[in-house]
Amino acid sequence: MDILINEYYNLEQTLELEQSIISKKQSHNGYSVEREYINSKEYHDKFEKLAVNKDVQQSIYIQTGRLLEHVDGHGEEKMVAIDARTGKFIVDNFAREGRIESTSFTNDEYLLIQKSKNSVVLIHNHSENGRPSAQDLLTYLNDLHIRLSIVACHDGTLYE
């Protein structure tokens, strides 16, 4: 029985890796996501090195793909929060207008994060592929509810 479960798990993992995390688009500009790399096994494997459990690693990977799909071709930054223990989606700020070089949650969105029993993982993008800003670092250091903060760049670079 254990062999069947392991085979099923391996098949499931293989199928997940074969599916594109971000779709192809016809137009490209300076803010376009590097689709080929983002859809690669090498990119997926970066998430397996994160210091969280496998379910959370996979959730971070999926939410990062969803984030990059949303901002592909745009200079604005957006953000997603997930539960750091379960990987469950908490909130994102995709529904409103974004800003270039900064992002934040509204008070109502942040309240959803504060209501979480567990710590959270924040994921946001840097469309110009830059390192985490001073504000990114301060937010992470000053909010004890944040377990992990990830910056996903459009070129496939990840900062944690």
How would you describe each model-predicted region?
Residues D2-K46, S104-E160:
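Active-site-proximal loop/helix of nucleotide/amide-processing enzymes and allied scaffolds
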Residues D55-E69:
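Short, basic/aromatic recognition patches
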Residues V71-E77:
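Short, flexible loop/turn motifs enriched in small residues
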Residues E77-R85, S149-A152:
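Short beta-strand scaffold segments in enzyme catalytic cores
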Residues R85, F94-R96, H124-H126:
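Short glycine-rich, polar/acidic loop-and-turn segments at beta strand-coil junctions
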Residues G87-K88, T157:
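Residue-level signal for well-ordered, solvent-exposed loop/turn and beta-edge residues enriched
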Residues I90, A95-L112:
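Active-site-proximal segments of catalytic enzyme domains
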